[in-house]
Amino acid sequence: MKYGVKYEIDQSIPNDLPDFPFIDEKDYPSERWEITLKDQDTIIFSFNFLYIGKFLNEIKRYCKNRIITFETNIPKENNFYLLYHFIIWKNKNNWCEDSKVLIFKNSMIFIFCETRIKIDIDNNEIIIKSNPKTDTTLELKMSKFLENLKEKPLQVKNYYYFFTILSKVSNSVLINDDGFDIWIYSLEYPLFIIAKNGTGKTRFLKKVFTNSGILKCKQSIYLNEFMVLSFSNGVNNEEVKFFEEFLNVYKAHSMLSTLNNKGFLTKYIWNSINEVLKSNNLPFSLLPSDLKSDRLLFKMDDVTLYYHDLSSGEKTLFIVFALIVFYQDNYSGIADEEVLLLLDEIETTLHAQSLRVLFNAIHKQRNNLKIIMSTHNSTSLRIASEYGFHYYLLEKSLTISDGNSVKIKELKSHENAISYVSDGMLSVVDSSKLVFVEDDDDSKFYEIAYKKLFNYPHTTRLVFCNAGIKNNSQHDLNQVSLILKKMDGNDENVKSIQKLINTLKETNTIGGKTSVKEKVKLLSEKSVTEESFRLGNSQIIGLLDKDDGKNEGEFLITIDYYSYEMFLCSPLVLFYMIKNEFLKTSPDSHLSTITTTTPSSQEINTNLSQQDMVCFVIEKLIEKEVETKNRETNKTWKEYLDIFYEGIRSTTLFDVKLENQAIIKVPEIFINGFGKKGKGHNLFDTLVRIFAFGLNMQESTEKLKIKTLEAFEKMSTDNIPSCLRDTFLKVMNYSLKKITNNNNNNNNNNNNNKIKN
C-alpha cells in the first residue's frame, strides 16, 4: 500500500501563533507508550490517522534534533472533507499549558481526542494504542481556538460536527496499483456503489478485492453476474477461490454421508443451506452430490436438477445464501465484519420480490459481513432503502492531478441515487408518507414499531397521525347538541345544524376506522396519476385494524391482527414486561407468586428460547387464575375470564413468524382475541384485570399500556412478528403500485376507445 503525502518537519516553532486550548491531565490519565526506532537518524511513521498529543511528547525524547518524516494516506487536497493536515508540537515539559500549533504551507495543525488510535511504525513492527475518554468541553475550547486563527480551516457553525468529520477520515484509504488511485472515505455497510459508464465500478471492486486489507478485512469475495450464472470464471483463479472451497466441502460432506457417518459431522452443508432456502420460501433444495461428478444437485417438486437448470434469479439467491452459510460454518475464527463481499451487478436478473429476499438476507448479515454492491438498476436502489443500505457515488477525482484517479462520496438518499443512474429521468418523491390510524394509542405504537424496524437513513419515512378528533372537541359537539335541542325544533336551520353535528359525531369520533376512511377519502379523492403522485396526492394512507376484515379499499391497508393491542398482548412482550417489572414487586403484593418463581434477569436472557418465553408467560398467567377470578365481581367479566383461560390452555396453536425468521406457536386467543365484539380490547382488558397495576380499572389500564409499550420498545427486534414489517412495507410501496395499476387501466381504456372509434 502506498501513501499519498510525505512531510519533513523541523523543530522550529513560530512565535506569533495563538495558544492552543489545553486538555486537563486528570481527564486523560497517563498511559504507557512504546516506540521502537528502526533508524537512529530518521523515524518513519505510517498513519491511518494523525493523532497528536502525548505521542509527539514521547517522540521528542527519542528524536532530539533529528528530522522526523510523517507519511500519511490523507491527501493534501481533499475537497470532500476539506481536511487540513495537522500536528501539534510540545515545547516544554508541561505540555497541557504550553502546547503550540505549528502552521505549515496550506496546512493547519490541530489536536483532538479520538476514541480509538492505532499507529503503525514502519512495517507494522510495533503498534502504539491510546483510548482517551471523550471530552464534552473540547467543543467549546476548540471553537475559541479557531476564532483566534487568521486562516480559518473550515467554515462551519457546529465545530463538534467538524471534528466528527475529521474522525471519519481515519477510515480513508488510498489504493495505488498500476497508476490507478482510488480515494475511499468512511464507509457504512451494506452499501451500493453507483457510477456513470466508464468511471470504473468493476475496476474499483476488483482493486478492493485484491487489497482487502485496506478495509480491515481478512477475507474478500468478488462475484459478478457471469460468475454467478456459470459458477465459474476461467480467467482469475483467485476470484473463484470461494467456488473451489465450497465445492471441496460439498464433495467431502457428500462422501461422508454415503459412509453413514455417525461421529464426524452433526450437520451437513446442505442442511444449513436448505434451512435458509426454506425460510425464504425458495422452491428448491440442495442435495448431496452423486460423487460421479463435481456438479451440484438440487431438488424441485421431486425432480432432480443441476445448477444450470436453475433460473438466473434462483442461481443468484442460491450463491449468496450458500456463501453466507459457508463462511458462518467454516470460518468461525474470523471476527465479525472481517469478511468483505463484493457483488458486481449480480441482482439485475431479480424481480422485485426476489430483490426483497436478497436484501433481507444481506440486512440480517450486516453485523457479520461487509457488503458492497454495484448497480445501475433503479428498482434495486429503491427497494434496498427498506433494508438499511447506504449509497455512494464513484466519480473521477478533480483534485488529484492523475486523471486515472477516482473518489467516492456518500449520497444523501436513495432518491439521489435513482436520479443519478437515470440521468434525472426518474424523480422519486416517496421519501415520506402520512399514515392515518384509529387513535392516539395506535399512533404511539406504530411510531415506536416503525423506528425499531426501519431505523435507516435512506428509507421511506412514515408519519403516523390520529384520524379522530380530540376529547375536548367531542365534548364541544355534545354541548352544541344540547343547546340545539332547547331551541325551536321546527326551525329548518336548527334541523340542518343538528344533522351536521350528528354526522360529525359519527364520522369524527375519538378514533375509529370510520374516521380513518373519511380522512383518507377526503384527502386522496383525486385520481392517482403520475402527475398527482409527484404532487403528493397519493402519499396519504389509512392503516386499519383487522376487525371484521372488511376494511380494504382505496389507500387503505389492514394489519394482520385484530387490533394493534394484539401486538402488545403478545406473550413475548408480556415476558419482557414480567422481566422488567415483576422482579421489582414487593413480596406482599398479589404478584408475589410470579415474583418468587421468576428466574433472575440474567437467567431469563441466557437460558430461555423464544418458545420457552411463551410457555413461561402462559404458566404465570395460569398461576394467577384463581386469584384474578376471586377479585372479579362483574358477571360478564367472570365469563370473559373463563373464556380467556380456556383459550390459553387450548391445544389449537398458531404459527407466528418472527423477525429473526424463528417460528413460535401461540394460542389462537393471542392472535384473534375473543368475544363477539371488541376482541382485541377484551384480551387487553383481561390482562388489565390479571396484572392489576393500579388501584382501579382506569389506572390499571393506563399503567398496563405504558408498561407493555415500554417492554415492546426495549425488547429485541428479533421478537417482533414479521407481519408487522410486512405491513409497513405495504404502506411504503402502496403509491408506486397504485400508479402502475391506474396507468395500465388508463392505457387499456384508451386502447378500448380507439377500437370503438
From Swiss-Prot:
Superkingdom of source: Eukaryota
One Pfam match: AAA_21
Gene3D superfamilies xrefs: P-loop containing nucleotide triphosphate hydrolases
Residue ranges that the Swiss-Prot or TrEMBL entry lists as coiled coil: none
One GO molecular-function entry: ATP binding
Organism: Dictyostelium discoideum (Social amoeba)
Protein name: Uncharacterized protein DDB_G0284767
